[in-house]
Design a protein with these regions (language model features):
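ABC family nucleotide-binding domain
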Residues: 2-162
Length: 163
């Protein structure tokens, strides 16, 4: 069963044709890597899957929802599709634990104690259990990336996109 389907998807930024007639199916549980030079549309493709960019034409189905349909609840899509950005987008004024727990607490409205325990487990999984009280500015780039991964996993998504 497919998780993501592109059918003749195009994306324009003004006159620039960023995605041209993309056809791709990603099945549940499948791992896919998109490679290409800088500026080839990899980030744009991921941002379309997560609903951060709208496609210009074609059909994009994510988890059985048609993203070209303006009635589709994009927040519901984003709850099920995690994203780890190139620049991680961590909150500089929040410590590592707060960065990981913010989504499940505010967006999913989950029990704060459960969320914190799961966050500690995730931080242990990514080798940062001793950094829960540190702030992003105190971490190396690799450590920040692992916090971003833990933060994405904390939302229990059905898919995770890595840019």
């Amino acid at each position: 069963m497919s998780m993501i389907e592109f059918h003749d998807v195009n994306k324009y930024f003004g006159k620039f044709h960023a995605l041209k007639n993309i056809n791709l199916t990603v099945d549940r549980g499948e791992v896919v890597t998109i490679i290409g030079p800088s500026g080839s549309g990899k980030s744009t493709l991921l941002r379309c899957i997560n609903g951060l960019e709208r496609i210009t034409s074609g059909q994009l189905i994510v988890n059985d929802f048609d993203l070209a349909d303006k009635k589709t609840d994009m927040n519901r899509i984003r709850k099920n599709v995690g994203m780890v950005f190139q620049h991680f987008n961590l909150y500089a004024n929040k410590n590592v634990l707060q960065n990981v727990t913010l989504g499940p607490d505010l967006v999913l409205k989950r029990n704060k104690q459960e969320v914190e325990q799961e966050a500690h487990d995730l931080l242990k999984m990514v080798g940062l259990e001793n950094k829960a009280d540190s702030f992003p500015g105190e971490l190396s780039g690799g450590q920040q990336q692992r916090v971003a991964i833990a933060r994405s996993l904390a939302m229990q998504p059905k898919a995770i996109l890595f840019d």
